[in-house]
Every structure is written in structure tokens, then in C-alpha cells.
């Protein structure tokens, strides 16, 4: 199974596919599937990618500098007209099943200094939705911990 993941990752890299595309596309063939309770195929894809390509994903010049994307999150909140617009969009993303995108929007609100009770509640909802759909030990432990932190 891991040979398949390895070979598909390297094949995708050679075809010029980006990391996130490969993380979303690569799956274990049904005859090798034993569940992902302890690890995740997407995590293995990332590890294989970074083993060969390193930390630089070749997607943005900003990867080469010490300034994280969160440094401009307050600017994004301001440009969006405030946290409420981003919270509404995060709610729409959650309702549409785009939980990971909802988390990105909530991170912008919270990292941009506009975090409030509503953003924390929404983040709890997203984490709970993600928790409900996983049977992975490490991911469920992380999500439960984050829910506890968000609620405190």
C-alpha cells in the first residue's frame, strides 16, 4: 500500500502536480485498504513529497521569507469589511461541506485580531463537524484538543 502511495506521489510530482492536489487525489487501491485509523494517506503523501522536494513547495515567493501569511490577516479582515463578513462566509462554507475552507476563513479572523465569541463558536462547530467524520486516532485527538481549547 505504501509503495502505491509513494509511486503515485512521485509520479504526480514528475507530472508537475502540486502537493495539495496530490494529497486530495491519491488513494489506496481497494484491495489494500485497511482503514486510516492511525495515519492518513494524505499525510503520507505530504511526507513523501517533502522527503524528495523539501519544505519549499514552489508555489509562492513568500515561502522563502520569514513573514507568515498570518501577518496580513488583520489587513484581510479590514478589507473584507470586518469579521462578520468572514464569519458569514465561513458559515456558508461549513453549510456547503467545505469545512477546511471554513477553517481557513476562521483562522484569518482569529489571527487578524478580530476573534470574538462568535468566531470561537463557529470554529468549534467546524472542528466538531471534522471530528464526526474521522476515525483517525491522531486527527480525532487533535480535534478534541482544539475544541477544548476553543471552548475555554
Description of each model-found segment:
Residues 1-152:
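Accessory terminal helices/loops
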